[in-house]
Design a protein with these regions (language model features):
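Extreme N-terminal basic, low-complexity initiation segments
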Residues: 1-11
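Short, low-complexity intrinsically disordered segments enriched in A/P/G/S/L with frequent Arg
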Residues: 14-32, 42-47
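Conserved, mostly hydrophobic/aromatic
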Residues: 68, 127, 179, 195, ...
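A short, Lys/Arg-enriched amphipathic alpha-helix followed by its capping loop at the start of a domain
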Residues: 67-73
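Glycine-rich phosphate-binding active-site loops on the catalytic face of alpha/beta enzymes
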Residues: 75-84, 130-133, 184-185, 226-249
């Protein structure tokens, strides 16, 4: 991944970000223009994956945030969906120190006031729309929060083929800075796996993360199959629902990097 684009993707939210430098502004322009001409070298056939963005979702404990930060995780996810065993309150998330990782809030609701208020309370750098939020909802959030701060989740299994998925990504691209492709047909954290081979050669208008049942045992193969810009771990690194296992976090990063973390 070109370093200027990587810096842009890891910019913080309002109040914590510096003004983008010239190279970062160029990356922003490339993103806004859409298409697949992003200057990104993604891993293929065993090439290095050290520049992948790594997100760890479902964080609730300071000790695990410390572990993730020490291992080089880029983004930490806080789930604001009451039905999830990994849910936290905005106040609890605000009390947790992300140790330099970008703070991502995961929402299944389309209650825009709640999303906006939580983004402020929990000091979120990114907002992940992980439900059936309408385009109108995303457009409003893009105006109030900034489109580059939105991560739009799509489920490849909903589409008859890759081209239909690409068309829907284009439809949402104006109100998203990044996509996340998850397993199943809704929700997340189920442990179901995305078919990486089915995403090989995907033409995406924005950088995208691969999610869905990623574990230390399968993440390297999944990345090499479809070359995402990053990965999102959740249930695959747990000893039980809602409880992350530090040894599995280390094992997953070791599997990705091909060396001890």
């Amino acid at each position: 991944m070109e370093e200027s684009l990587r810096r842009f993707l890891l910019r913080r939210g309002p109040g914590t970000a510096r003004p983008p430098d010239r190279e970062s502004r160029g990356a922003v322009a490339s993103l806004a223009a859409g298409g697949i001409s992003l200057p990104i070298n993604r891993p293929q056939n065993g090439a290095t994956v050290n520049d992948l963005l790594i997100k760890l979702c479902g964080m609730r404990e300071q000790a695990l945030l410390d572990c993730a930060a020490d291992l080089g995780v880029n983004l930490c996810g806080f789930i604001f969906a009451p039905e999830s065993p990994r849910a936290v309150t905005p106040e609890r998330a605000a009390a947790l120190d992300s140790r330099g990782m970008l703070r991502v809030g995961v929402f299944t609701t389309d209650d825009m006031r709640f999303i906006e208020a939580t983004a402020a309370t929990a000091r979120l750098d990114r907002v992940q729309l992980h439900g059936d939020q309408s385009v109108t909802c995303a457009e409003r959030l893009s105006r109030t929060l900034g489109a580059e701060r939105l991560i739009r989740v799509l489920w490849p299994r909903r589409y008859p083929d890759r081209h239909a998925l690409e068309a829907d990504m284009e439809r949402h691209a104006h109100a998203a800075g990044m996509f996340l492709l998850d397993a199943g047909t809704s929700g997340g954290g189920s442990g179901q796996r995305v078919d990486g081979e089915g995403l090989r050669g995907l033409h995406a208008p924005r950088p995208w993360l691969l999610a869905g049942g990623l574990t230390p045992e399968n993440v390297r193969e999944a990345v090499e199959a479809c070359a995402p810009h990053g990965v999102d771990f959740n249930s695959g690194l747990e000893s039980e629902p809602g409880r992350k296992d530090p040894s599995r976090i280390r094992a997953a990063l070791t599997a990705l990097r091909g060396k001890s973390s």
